């Protein structure tokens, strides 16, 4: 009698070095739609509705740049509020490489649990490597990716 062993291979989605996804950002009673674009150097958030329609916030790990129509200004990131969406996404994506960040295979994707300056986060990624959601344990701030 011969027994063949078969191992189920779990395909883990790659952590995207760059992506471009629409999302809804919610903090308390306030929410806005945006496009979040990450490349190897920075994260940009383009606001798609509310009074800030068209505002682009870009964070490169040091500076936050605000661009609105012809207006553009750089602000040192450390002097800026940690709740800025571009800073939050940038820091979370960098934290995914941290050895303390936990990775769990879940139905339909992967759940990452880690920590940034903003707090402890839970990031859920779909099987196709797109992002699904980002939430923080001690905050009502969350991002639902489309």
Regions found by a protein language model. Give the residues of each.
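Short, acidic/polar N-cap/turn motifs at the starts of alpha helices
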Residues: 22, 33, 54, 63, ...
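Gly/Pro-enriched, hydrophobic low-complexity segments
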Residues: 44-49, 99-146
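Bacterial signal peptide processing site
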Residues: 7-10
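An acidic-aromatic
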Residues: 36-95, 139-141
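C-terminal motif of bacterial Sec signal peptides marking the signal peptidase cleavage site
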Residues: 2-5
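Residues that act as N-cap/strand-start positions at coil-to-secondary-structure junctions
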Residues: 28-30, 39, 51-53, 106-108, ...
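A short, Trp-centered hydrophobic/proline-enriched beta-strand micro-motif
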Residues: 13-30
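Short polybasic amphipathic segments
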Residues: 23, 62-67, 131-134
